[in-house]
């Protein structure tokens, strides 16, 4: 009878512990649903608004620096593999089978009748048997610490009844923001990876020299002009002097002096050396002065002849 009483007390204490666990679970569920989840949802809404407003600046700085920030990305939906789905379905089926077996054993244990005990145990007190058969347990005055049980009384659980250990699933959090896991950190570390430089195609420059409405640039004019050496420059100056002398003789009427000419710049004639150009211009000016003097003297002689 001592063993029977101990089993009865143990079952009642177990049921009381289960009731207490159920009450604690309901309390935790009520706390999570009424207090924690609304705060988390409100925080998520505020974070979404902040993220939407900062997207423009993130893209602007990435484009200006030609980099990409990898720590502040939006979550990307993870594609599920068919093999993972098969493993999950097999594990759920095994859990359901184990749960049904445990329920069946509990029902058999709760509906234990008098026929399962020996005659010596049945001939005991009827009140004890009635208390044992009742479904609603009574609170015992004895606590769990006062009850002492031998290790042999506890039957070990068979291996086929134990829940198989699951392998840790390595779910890669691809595309998820790393900042969500470091909310309380003070030092932010964001990985920055440079992008590949874009190959800019060389744009064809419009040939402005070919257009009749656009004047050529002075650089192209200088490049097109042939470089004059000393012989060509002296030859050009001599030809210019002869042409000027002939033009004076043909244009000016008789008895009038030709106009005085200005000093020519050596740069307009394309002379390379400035010193040589100055010397040539001085010699040319002297020749012109002598011509003017001779012409004046000739005019004076004609006037004297007329008188």
Swiss-Prot record:
Pfam families (alphabetical): DASH_Ask1
Composition bias type Basic and acidic residues, residue spans: 298-307
Cell location: Nucleus; Cytoplasm, Cytoskeleton, Spindle; Chromosome, Centromere, Kinetochore; Cytoplasm, Cytoskeleton
UniProt keyword list: Cell cycle, Cell division, Centromere, Chromosome, Chromosome partition, Cytoplasm, Cytoskeleton, Kinetochore, Meiosis, Microtubule, Mitosis, Nucleus, Phosphoprotein
Top-rank taxon: Eukaryota
Gene Ontology terms describing biological process: cell division; cortical microtubule organization; mitotic sister chromatid biorientation; protein transport along microtubule to mitotic spindle pole body; spindle attachment to meiosis I kinetochore
Chain positions covered by the region annotation Disordered: 117-137, 250-307
Effect of gene knockout: Sensitive to thiabendazole and osmotic stress. Double knockout of mal3 and ask1 leads to cell shape defects, including 6% T-shaped cells.
GO annotation, cellular component aspect: condensed chromosome, centromeric region; cytosol; DASH complex; kinetochore; mitotic spindle kinetochore microtubule; mitotic spindle polar microtubule; mitotic spindle pole body; nucleus
Bias (Polar residues): 250-284
PANTHER family: DASH COMPLEX SUBUNIT ASK1
Physiological role: Component of the DASH complex that connects microtubules with kinetochores and couples microtubule depolymerisation to chromosome movement; it is involved in retrieving kinetochores to the spindle poles before their re-orientation on the spindle in early mitosis and allows microtubule depolymerization to pull chromosomes apart and resist detachment during anaphase.
Family: Belongs to the DASH complex ASK1 family.
UniProt-recorded name of the protein: DASH complex subunit ask1
Species of provenance: Schizosaccharomyces pombe (strain 972 / ATCC 24843) (Fission yeast)
UniProt lineage: Eukaryota, Fungi, Dikarya, Ascomycota, Taphrinomycotina
């Amino acid at each position: 009878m001592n063993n029977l009483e101990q089993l009865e007390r143990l079952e009642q204490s177990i049921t009381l512990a289960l009731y207490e666990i159920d009450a604690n679970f309901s309390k935790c569920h009520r706390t999570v649903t009424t207090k924690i989840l609304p705060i988390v949802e409100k925080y998520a809404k505020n974070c979404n608004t902040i993220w939407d407003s900062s997207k423009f600046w993130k893209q602007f700085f990435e484009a200006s620096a030609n980099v990409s920030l990898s720590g502040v990305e939006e979550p990307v939906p993870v594609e599920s593999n068919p093999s993972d789905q098969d493993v999950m379905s097999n594990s759920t089926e095994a859990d359901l089978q184990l749960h049904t077996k445990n329920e069946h054993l509990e029902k058999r244990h709760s509906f234990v009748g008098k026929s399962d005990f020996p005659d010596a145990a049945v001939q005991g007190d009827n009140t004890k048997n009635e208390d044992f058969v009742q479904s609603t347990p009574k609170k015992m005055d004895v606590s769990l610490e006062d009850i002492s049980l031998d290790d042999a009384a506890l039957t070990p659980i068979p291996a086929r009844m134990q829940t198989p250990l699951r392998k840790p699933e390595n779910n890669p959090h691809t595309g998820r923001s790393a900042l969500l896991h470091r909310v309380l950190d003070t030092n932010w570390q964001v990985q920055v990876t440079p992008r590949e430089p874009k190959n800019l195609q060389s744009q064809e420059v419009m040939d402005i020299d070919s257009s009749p409405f656009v004047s050529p640039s002075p650089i192209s004019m200088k490049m097109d002009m042939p470089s004059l050496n000393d012989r060509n420059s002296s030859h050009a100056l001599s030809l210019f002097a002869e042409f000027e002398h002939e033009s004076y003789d043909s244009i000016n009427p008789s008895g009038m002096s030709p106009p005085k000419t200005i000093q020519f710049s050596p740069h307009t004639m394309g002379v390379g050396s400035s010193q040589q150009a100055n010397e040539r211009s001085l010699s040319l000016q002297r020749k012109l002065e002598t011509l003017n003097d001779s012409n004046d003297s000739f005019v004076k002689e004609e006037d004297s002849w007329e008188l």
